From Swiss-Prot:
GO terms for biological process: antibacterial humoral response; defense response to Gram-positive bacterium; innate immune response. This is Cecropin. Its main location: secreted. InterPro entries: Cecropin. It comes from Bombyx mori (Silk moth). The modification Isoleucine amide is found at residue 35. It is found in: Secreted.
Length: 35
């Protein structure tokens, strides 16, 4: 039971980490697209 919960927690952290890292890149791409 707890293994599944820990796996979900780890995946959630990875997704959050990816969003935090991708955020600035997405903003830069968005600015480049509007120019």
């Amino acid at each position: 039971r707890w293994k599944i919960f820990k796996k979900i927690e780890k995946v959630g952290q990875n997704i959050r980490d990816g969003i935090v890292k991708a955020g600035p890149a997405v903003a830069v791409v968005g600015q480049a697209a509007t120019i």
